[in-house]
C-alpha cells in the first residue's frame, strides 16, 4: 500500500524542521512525541497550528515532524514554515491565502554576533570622559 504524503522544509533562526503531511485525523507528532508534550507552552503550539487553522484543515492530516537546532521559539517558527510549504504542495491554490498571513516568507533575522570590546553585540561599557 502506497502512502501519499506531502513534504515541506522550514527554517527559522538556527532551527530546521522536516514536515510530512499524511491524510489522517489531525494528530501532530514532533520528534516522536505529541505536540503538547514536546513544547509544553501553549503559545508555541498555537504558532505550529496557525497555517492549518487559517486554511481550515486542522483535522484533515496527520503531521510527522523532525526538528533540530535552536530553541523553542525558533523550532515552532521552523515547523510553521514547513507545514505551510507542505500545504502548498498539497494544494497550490492555498498559497495566496498563506502568503497574505506571512507564513510563506522565511524570517531571515539572525542573532547578531558579539563584537570585541563590547559586552554584547551593541551594548558597551559606560563611557567616561575623564
Swiss-Prot record:
Keywords of this entry: Ribonucleoprotein, Ribosomal protein
GO molecular function annotations of the record: RNA binding; structural constituent of ribosome
GO cellular component, one term: cytosolic small ribosomal subunit
Top-level taxon: Bacteria
GO process terms (BP): translation
Residue ranges of the region described as Disordered: 105-130
Biased composition (Basic and acidic residues): 105-115
PROSITE patterns, per the entry: RIBOSOMAL_S9
Pfam family, one: Ribosomal_S9
InterPro entries named in the record: Ribosomal_Su5_D2-typ_SF, Ribosomal_uS9, Ribosomal_uS9_bac/plastid, Ribosomal_uS9_CS, Ribsml_uS5_D2-typ_fold_subgr
Biased composition (Basic residues): 116-130
NCBIfam families: PRK00132.1 (NF001099)
Family: Belongs to the universal ribosomal protein uS9 family.
Protein name: Small ribosomal subunit protein uS9
Organism of provenance: Buchnera aphidicola subsp. Schizaphis graminum (strain Sg)
Amino acid at each position: 500500500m502506497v502512502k501519499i504524503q506531502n513534504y515541506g522544509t522550514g527554517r527559522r533562526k538556527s532551527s530546521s524542521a522536516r514536515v510530512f503531511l499524511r491524510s489522517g485525523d489531525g494528530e501532530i507528532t514532533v520528534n516522536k512525541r505529541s505536540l503538547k508534550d514536546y513544547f509544553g507552552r501553549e503559545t508555541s503550539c498555537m504558532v505550529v497550528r496557525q497555517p492549518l487553522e487559517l486554511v481550515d484543515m486542522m483535522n484533515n492530516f496527520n503531521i510527522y515532524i523532525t526538528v533540530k537546532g535552536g530553541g523553542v521559539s525558533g523550532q515552532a517558527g521552523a515547523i510553521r514554515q514547513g507545514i505551510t510549504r507542505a500545504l502548498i504542495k498539497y494544494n497550490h491554490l492555498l498559497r495566496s491565502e498563506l502568503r497574505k498571513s506571512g507564513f510563506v516568507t522565511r524570517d531571515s533575522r539572525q542573532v547578531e554576533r558579539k563584537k570585541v570590546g563590547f559586552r554584547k553585540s551593541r551594548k558597551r561599557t559606560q563611557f567616561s570622559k575623564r
